[in-house]
């Protein structure tokens, strides 16, 4: 979605105020808003990650979870998680599993000052989606993603420690604990 996408402004506790603002406005003014992150986990407990294009304005060339996005005004996080799965990796989920297979893990608050004119103040809802989608089934967007791969939770922790991962990493320990239980 573009900078005109409408998002719901939240207070500093993550409560929606019922007031829409454009994506450009919330980032320019540092207004709080909601977003989702989804970890796609296969039967081997490997997580799908993507390498952001070097052309990206924010965090070029860094690895990140493959599914993330803003929650549009008037939508909920769960339906957003399902639609972002299609948008981000080009995989249409069968209707019967679209929502029931997403496991809510936690919410967290994240502040990332990107530049003088771009403040990312977001409340993330973090979901896990268990599915054995083969890597060749994904259709990534040119100019957005350089590569996708499945890795272990330990590999993600190591990559983050080396500075190879997107700096928004509050979800890593939650995912690591979830996966290592099995």
PLM-predicted stretches and their roles:
Residues 24, 61, 67, 73, ...:
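Nudix hydrolase/Nudix homology domain
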Residues 48-49, 66-103:
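The catalytic Nudix box helix
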Residues 35-69:
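A glycine-rich, hydrophobic loop/mini-helix early in the fold
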Residues 2-37, 41-43:
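Acidic, metal-coordinating catalytic segment for phosphate/diphosphate chemistry
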Residues 7, 30, 46-47, 137, ...:
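A residue-level structural signature of the nucleotidyltransferase/glycosyltransferase Rossmann-like core
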Residues 33, 97-99, 122:
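Short gly/pro-enriched beta-turn/loop segments at secondary-structure junctions
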């Amino acid at each position: 979605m573009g900078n005109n996408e409408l998002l719901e402004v939240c207070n500093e506790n993550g409560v929606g105020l019922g007031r829409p603002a454009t994506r450009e406005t919330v980032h320019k003014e540092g207004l709080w808003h909601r977003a989702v992150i989804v970890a796609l986990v296969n039967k081997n407990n490997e997580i799908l990650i993507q390498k952001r294009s070097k052309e990206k304005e924010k965090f070029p060339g860094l690895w990140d979870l493959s599914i993330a996005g803003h929650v549009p005004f008037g939508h909920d996080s769960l339906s957003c998680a399902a639609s972002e799965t299609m948008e981000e990796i080009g995989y249409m989920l069968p209707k019967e599993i679209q929502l029931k297979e997403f496991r809510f893990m936690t919410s967290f608050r994240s502040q990332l000052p990107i530049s003088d004119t771009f403040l990312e103040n977001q409340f993330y809802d973090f979901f896990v989606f268990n599915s054995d989608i083969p890597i060749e089934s994904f259709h990534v967007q040119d100019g957005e993603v350089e590569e996708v791969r499945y890795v272990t939770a330990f590999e993600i922790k190591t990559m983050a420690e080396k500075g190879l991962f997107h700096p928004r990493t509050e979800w890593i320990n939650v995912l690591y604990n979830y996966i290592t239980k099995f």
